Structures are given as C-alpha cells and as structure tokens.
Amino acid sequence: MDFLNSSDQNLTSEELLHRMPSKILVSLTLSGLALMTTTINSLVIAAIIVTRKLHHPANYLICSLAVTDFLVAVLVMPFSIVYIVRESWIMGQVLCDIWLSVDIICCTCSILHLSAIALDRYRAITDAVEYARKRTPKQAGIMITIVWIISVFISMPPLFWRHQGTSRDDECIIKHDHIVSTIYSTFGAFYIPLVLILILYYKIYKAAKTLYHKRQASRIAKEELNGQVLLESGEKSIKMVSTTYVPEKSLSDPSTDFDKIHNTVKSPRCKLRHEKSWRRQKISGTRERKAATTLGLILGAFVICWLPFFVKELVVNVCEKCKISEEMANFLAWLGYLNSLINPLIYTIFNEDFKKAFQKLVRCQY
C-alpha cells in the first residue's frame, strides 16, 4: 500500500513533494521520543530487578510505573506515529479497538501510579514508624493491583460508548457524544488524581519542612548544652592571654581581626561548635530546597504534560461549537505521552542508588 493515505490522492505531485519532508521530520522526531521512552524505562526496570539495594516497596511502585510507561512507548506510540503520518487509520477496526484500549488504560494507569507514589511518600513521612512496619512488598503489590483495576474501570466505559455511534473505517478516535461519559473519563483519569496529588505533595512538603525545623532545633539545643558543659569543664584550661593592647574603639572597628585576638569570650571549642551548627543548618536548608525542587518538578511535569490534553477533551466534547485542529489534537496527545519519558527521569535522577545502578548497567558490571 502507498505510504500516503487516500486523502492525498486528490493532491498534485508538487503538493505531495512539498509535504513529504515535514512528514519525514515528524516521523523521525516522534520515533526518537518513542525510542528514548523505551530505553529509559527499560533501564529503570532493569536497575530495580538486578540491584538488590533497590529491592524496596517504594521502588516497586516506581518499577510498576516504568512498566506502564514502557507499554505506552511500545504499544501506543508506534501506532500513533503511523496514524499521524498517514493521516488516516489503515489497520482495521479490531486493531483500532485494541490500540485505543491499551492507550487509555496505560495512560490512565500511569497517572494513577503517580497518585499511588504520592500517597506512599505521604504516609512514609507523616507516619514513619507505623508505616515502616506496613510497607512490605505485599502491600506494594496490593497498591499496584488496585491501580490497574481502577484504570480498567475508568477506561472501559468510553470504549463502550464508542461502539454506540458510527465510526468511519479510516478513523480511530473516541467521540464523547455523551456528556456523562466525558465527565466520567476525564475526571476519573485526570482531574481527581490531580487534586489528590496536589493535596498530598503540599502536605508532604509541609511535613518535611516541619520535620527539618524540629531536627534543626533539637540539634541546636543539644549543641548549646554541650557547649555549656565544655565551658564549665574546661574553664580552668582556657587561657585568657592578652599579649596585645586593643583600645575600646577597636571593638567596633571592622578592620580588627577578632579571630586573632586571644582575649575573647568564646573558646576555640565553642567556636567550632558554632561552625558545625551553622553547617548543619545550611545542609538542612539545602535538603529542604532540594525536596521542594523535586516536588516542583514532579508536579510541574505532570500538569504541563497532561492538563492541556484533558482541558481539550472536556471543552471540545462538552461545547459543540468548540473545535480544534487535528494537528493541535495530535500535539496535545503526544505532550501527554511525553510524561512517560519524563517520569523515570524525575523519580530516579535525585536518587544516588539509581545513579550507581544505571552506571553499572551501562558498564555491564551488574
């Protein structure tokens, strides 16, 4: 069969020749994204499987997310590329039904995995002691199973409604002619998980911030107490040497180097304690900023990738007069698919164990 679809038959040779470079460029770009998504998610899955240090219930959720995103890259993206380049569906309605089913289920499952990971992290930081006992591989398996079951229940009704209307043989889309079906699918697959993720990560950030401040206050109090004990026990050994005469006005002179003057109130030990305290406060602040950055990247990537698509789905299918070009619809769909490439990067790039595991895999040292 000719590479160009039937709609191209009415075009002149010059028009076909003019459109060919853009189609090749689109095909290569999307194929590159699909290949990158497949490779990166494969690395995450392999790293968790072969690295014993990564055999942790929290990482099982990340592994399941990587499997879901891998399926998007292997089973969804290639068919979408062919559909976009040819501008018509040529693989029959049976394969269309299978493709749409896998597309909706996997994308919904990927989004729900993000909710499950957020819930897991929230419980781990707010109920650390009790949840550490409950956080077992079995519990992670139950969460993963529930996520897949919910994804299927959310995805099936839109596919059912699709067969209630008439579909052309050269198209493979879901027309949400029923407002109930549109609201059910969009809210179940995105809007409700979005609200849940926003609430959970806000609470995680607040809890982490409070925890950092409590630890910081506890360390400072402990160091102050240790400093007092050191002063009392070492009072006799501290020499108050005054070999240099310093006038009173020099105390306010910024050029005076107080570190070299021996007749100061603080002992070297107290100064060392103060410096350690300051360094720990700095480390605590750095960790807090790192946590905020990580959460910001997770939420930002999720919202940027999926919000435009689901806004389009809701508006276009509820508002009869609202139309969108096929090119824009394809762009928004692939913007959502892009989240499957970003997910493994965000959830592993800040983890040193994952970095080391990736290096071993690349060097074949596993």
UniProtKB/Swiss-Prot annotation:
Chain positions carrying an annotated carbohydrate: N5, N10
Entry keyword annotation includes Phosphoprotein: no
- Provide the alphabetized UniProt keywords: Cell membrane, Disulfide bond, G-protein coupled receptor, Glycoprotein, Membrane, Receptor, Transducer, Transmembrane, Transmembrane helix
Query: One Pfam family name from the record?
Result: 7tm_1
Q: Which residues lie on this side of the membrane: Extracellular?
A: 1-24, 82-96, 160-178, 316-327
Per its record, how is this protein called by name?
A: 5-hydroxytryptamine receptor 1F
Of the GO CC terms on this record, one is: plasma membrane
Q: Which GO terms describe its biological process?
A: adenylate cyclase-activating adrenergic receptor signaling pathway; adenylate cyclase-inhibiting G protein-coupled receptor signaling pathway; positive regulation of MAPK cascade
Disulfide bonds, paired cysteine numbers: C96-C172
Gene3D superfamilies of this UniProt entry?
Rhodopsin 7-helix transmembrane proteins (1.20.1070.10)
Short sequence motif named NPxxY motif, residue ranges: 343-347
Which residues face the membrane's Cytoplasmic side? Answer: 50-59, 120-139, 203-291, 351-366
> Where does the source fall among the domains of life?
Eukaryota
Chief place where the protein resides? membrane
Question: What protein family does this chain belong to?
Answer: Belongs to the G-protein coupled receptor 1 family.
Per the annotation, the residue ranges of the short sequence motif DRY motif are 120-122
- What does this protein's UniProt record list under function? G-protein coupled receptor for 5-hydroxytryptamine (serotonin). Also functions as a receptor for various alkaloids and psychoactive substances. Ligand binding causes a conformation change that triggers signaling via guanine nucleotide-binding proteins (G proteins) and modulates the activity of downstream effectors, such as adenylate cyclase. HTR1F is coupled to G(i)/G(o) G alpha proteins and mediates inhibitory neurotransmission by inhibiting adenylate cyclase activity.
InterPro entries linked to this entry: 5HT1F_rcpt (IPR000450), 5HT_rcpt (IPR002231), GPCR_Rhodpsn (IPR000276), GPCR_Rhodpsn_7TM (IPR017452)
Question: Its topology with respect to the membrane?
Answer: Multi-pass membrane protein
Q: Which residues bind serotonin?
A: D103, C107
Source organism of the structure: Cavia porcellus
A GO MF label:
G protein-coupled serotonin receptor activity
Q: Where are the transmembrane segments?
A: 25-49, 60-81, 97-119, 140-159, 179-202, 292-315, 328-350
Cell compartment(s), UniProt = Cell membrane
**Per the record's keyword annotation, is Transcription included, yes or no?**
no
